[in-house]
Every structure is written in C-alpha cells, then in structure tokens.
Amino acid sequence: MQRLLTPVRQVLQVKRVMQEASLLPARLLPAAHPSFSTVPAVPLAKTDTWPKDVGILAMEVYFPAQYVDQTELEKFNKVEAGRYTVGLGQTQMGFCSVQEDVNSLCLTVVQQLMERTQLPWDSVGRLEVGTETIIDKSKAVKTVLMELFQDSGNTDIEGIDTTNACYGGTASLFNAANWMESSSWDGRYALVVCGDIAVYPSGNARPTGGAGAVAMLVGPEAPLVLERGLRGTHMENVYDFYKPDVTSEYPLVDGKLSIQCYLRALDKCYAFYRQKIEKQWKQAGIDRPFTLDDVQYMIFHTPFCKLVQKSLARLMFNDFLLASGDTQTGIYKGLEAFRGLKLEDTYTNKDVDKAFLKASLNMFNKKTKNSLYLSTYNGNMYTSSLYGCLASLLAHHSAQDLAGSRIGAFSYGSGLAASFFSFRVSQDASPGSPLEKLVSSTSDLQKRLASRKRVSPEEFTEIMNQREQYYHKMNFSPPGDKNSLFPGTWYLERVDELYRRKYARRPV
C-alpha cells in the first residue's frame, strides 16, 4: 500500500471522493459526515438532542472456505450417531488452516464491508475489535486493521481491542453507541469488528468449534436501532472457560459449569432488562409486565445450537414463574406442577427442561430458529456468534416481515460477562430504504455457505495438527494453497524471525 500522500494529492483525493460520492445512486446509508477532512464536526455537547436512532447501518459476514461434516466426524471419532448433529444441533463446522489467523479474518471482513458500502475510508472515526483469539499479548488486532486506512491518510480513529471470551463484540458495539451518544463524537461512523477462531483439542469439545468474523457499521438513522436504556447486564468471577496457557490456542473448559453459568446469566440479565423496560413503560403510562410476547425475534450467543433452544425455553420458564393470571390454559397448559420452583434450583432439572422445551417449540420456530442457520453450518464463532445469528435472521426474512419489530439479543462471555439488550427495526421497508438494503446484503449467505469445500475428517485433523505445530512459531511461511481461499480473502503470508506478520490478499 502507498504509505504517504503529498498535501496537494491529499486535497485532490478528498475532492475526488466527495465528487464520486455525490454521483453514486441512492446511498446504502443515511449521511453522517461523508468526509471529516472538509466537513467540520459539531461536538455533541453543543446540541440539545441525542443523535437519532443509533444502531447498525450495514453488516458483513466472513467465514472460512472449507468445512468438515459433523456426521462424518461422528463416524471418524467413533461416537454414536447423532451426538454432534442431534445432541449439539450442529451439521457442519467451518475451520481455518494455518493460512488464516484472527488478523486476516478481520482484515477480510472490514475490507469487504467498506468496498460494498463504497464509503470513504476517512468517514470512519472509531474502530473497535472484539476478540478472544490473542496472538500477541501487546499488539492489538485494531493496529493491523489500520493498514487498510493508510492510503486515505485517516489515522484519527478511536477504539482498540476488547477482550472477555465471547462478549468482546457486544462490549465493542456498546462502546460504539456510547461514543456516538457522547461529547466525544465527531460526526463520523463507527466500525465494530468481531472475529475469532474457535478450536479445541481432539475430544468431546472439538465439534463445538468454528471460525468467522462480522463487521458492523454503526451510525445514526439506522435500520436496526439499539434501544436506549434497555440493557440488562450480569457479571461475576467464575472459571467456566478460560485460556491461561499462552503457548496454546486451546481453552480450559468445564462444560457443565459453563452451561449453568450461561443459563444463570440469562436469568439475571432478562430480569434486569425486564425491570428497565417496565420502568420506561410506566413513565409512558403503560402498566403491564414485559414478556416474550413483546419480542418478535430472539437471538442468542450460540456455542452450539441445542443450547439456544434450551435458552428460549428458559426465558419462557421465567415468564411462567412471574405470570399472575391463568397458567392452566394457553401456552402454559400442563406446566402448573412447576409453579413453586425457584430459578436457582432448576439449572440441572431435566423435567423442567423437557417440559418447557416442548411448550416453547412453536415460539422457538417463530422467533429464533432461522437465526441459527450460520451457526448450524459453520459452528461457534465466539465473539461474532451472536451477530452471525443476527445476519442469519435478516437473511431469512424480508424487510416487510422485520419492519417495526423488536429483536431481543443475549450475549454471553465466559468468566463471565453477559447482557440482554434489544434492537428496534425501522418501520420503513420500502425499496431502497436502509432496512431493505441491509436485508438484501445478507441474501447471499446460503449461497456462500454452499460454495465452500467439504474436507474429510482425516484432512481436518491434519490441519488441526498443523495449527498446533505452527502456533507461536517464527520464521515460516504457512503451508497451503492460496487458491483454496475465497476471492478477496486476506491471508498470512509470512511470520519473520522477529514474529512480525505479513499479510496479502487473494485477488477478487
């Protein structure tokens, strides 16, 4: 990339970008400041209002170009049929070779988002990365992404990496919205990037892996608005999943404890969210309880798909315990035996699980099932998992179906940090609207997944062994065929004798 531009050439470049932007067809995005170089930002502190409808304007999803079939993996691992496909709810699992790392995943997804939206690179004023895939204890992924901004001369970009297991992406999204609704905002867009490679040692946990990245453009007048004041958060100190060994990319996991922590955090966050929305309603003259009926769609962080179905059932159980009216008819019919139970006593209660999984099945099919498409066929993407579910939901519904709805979201990161929050979808689903364009941008998700290469369990295992062999090595060029990557993918070209990483991009 060209490193420097003379002042004259910088001015010419800015003018050219502005002229080209004015000639584009109907813009994908509402206008913030198209170029900070020529349009002075007005500090928010000098205004009397918040920027309107801050949220997600555009999204881009990246996943690896190869996968292993979970049915074949069951046979290869000599486990009973259905352990992965039924027990976990997983059909396929995407994975990365040594050619890809978290930096390359994030480079790819950011470049693809910027190219598709045709935004000037200097229209971004904040970029934050959520990841738990740490390949350097000091140097952030965000600093590598700055390579993409060099030709524009834009180095005035706030934000850095945020890490806590699978929660970093959500923290980054909240930070972007907070920045935009503060006196620090300079009028430009924010980019939120979530990327991870989920890998486990050979054994029971390996089929719950995956890999991918999601980039989100955040700004005002968004089609997916973060509902202000409606975040229920729970945090505590627990060792359910953690990575203390810096010489390995594998975590230490207490699977049973982690599931209990996930469900306990869900209970806590849902209760806090419910309290806040009911308080808002009372201030508006509405005095009634909040339930899942007030959420048209519900997405979850997805370590594996079966846990998500159990989680929606758990939310229904929460509503049931608080229901003050008749619970002997309607959706709660046949559940009265569970009336006297306490949430904290039921995390391992199989009777509760079975009963509410059955009772909530129609609700699951309507509100959540479509959001699991990417997780089913690509696996766990850690920080980007929840937002892959959001993209899947958009890909399976029309703008007209989504318009005006509320999308509930539960984010969880082991250790632990969790939040329940919501998006309000724009009412405008007309052709060319920001919502219609956002939904249309996800329409190729199924086609892209179908275009991947299926790899045998034997080859998959060999590639996992290669990842172990090259992890934290220096002075090497990764093995593999660059042509096996999707066009436009960034990849690791070389690690030199000082551990410095060099990347290249496969031509589009």
UniProtKB/Swiss-Prot annotation:
SUPFAM superfamilies: Thiolase-like
UniProt PTM: Succinylated. Desuccinylated by SIRT5. Succinylation, at least at Lys-310, inhibits the enzymatic activity.
Recorded metabolic or biological pathway in which this protein acts: Metabolic intermediate biosynthesis; (R)-mevalonate biosynthesis; (R)-mevalonate from acetyl-CoA: step 2/3
EC class name: transferase
A Gene Ontology term for the protein's cellular component: mitochondrion
Catalytic activity: acetoacetyl-CoA + acetyl-CoA + H2O = (3S)-3-hydroxy-3-methylglutaryl-CoA + CoA + H(+)
N6-succinyllysine: residues carrying this PTM: 52, 256, 310, 333, 342, 350, 354, 358, 447, 473
Residues recorded as bearing N6-acetyllysine in the entry: 243, 256, 306, 310, 342, 350, 354, 358, 437, 447, 473
Family: Belongs to the thiolase-like superfamily. HMG-CoA synthase family.
Protein name: Hydroxymethylglutaryl-CoA synthase, mitochondrial
Originating organism: Bos taurus (Bovine)
Gene name, Swiss-Prot/TrEMBL: HMGCS2
